[in-house]
């Protein structure tokens, strides 16, 4: 009888931990899926955009390592805090509009 009393809280703890693990797994899958857009373009990845921004900063400044770090951190922060537009798609649409000319 004593084993039954001890096993019930352990079972509840295991069920709680299982639910937490499933929740974490769903969150990670959602974040991974949102990292690269459905169109499959690499430039839609916020990490890559930050890395490219860091590369540009590194080319403009002498300290390449600092530029990479600042650009990558800035890209990650911006992607998490703001709705970052898809620059590649916007530029492509704009260039197509310019090629067509006025209606």
From Swiss-Prot:
Segments crossing the lipid bilayer: 62-84
Signal peptide: none
Top-level taxon: Eukaryota
Keyword Cell cycle (UniProt): no
Protein location: Mitochondrion inner membrane
Cited function: Required to maintain cellular respiration.
Protein name: SLC35A4 upstream open reading frame protein
């Amino acid at each position: 009888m004593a084993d039954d009393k001890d096993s019930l809280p352990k079972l509840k703890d295991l069920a709680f931990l299982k639910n937490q693990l499933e929740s974490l797994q769903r969150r990670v899958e959602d974040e991974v899926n949102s990292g690269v857009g459905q169109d499959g373009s690499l430039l839609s990845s916020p990490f890559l955009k930050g890395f490219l921004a860091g590369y540009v900063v590194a080319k403009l400044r002498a300290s390449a390592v600092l530029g990479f770090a600042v650009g990558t951190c800035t890209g990650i922060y911006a992607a998490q805090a703001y709705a970052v537009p898809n620059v590649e798609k916007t530029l492509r649409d704009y260039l197509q509009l310019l090629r067509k000319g006025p209606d």
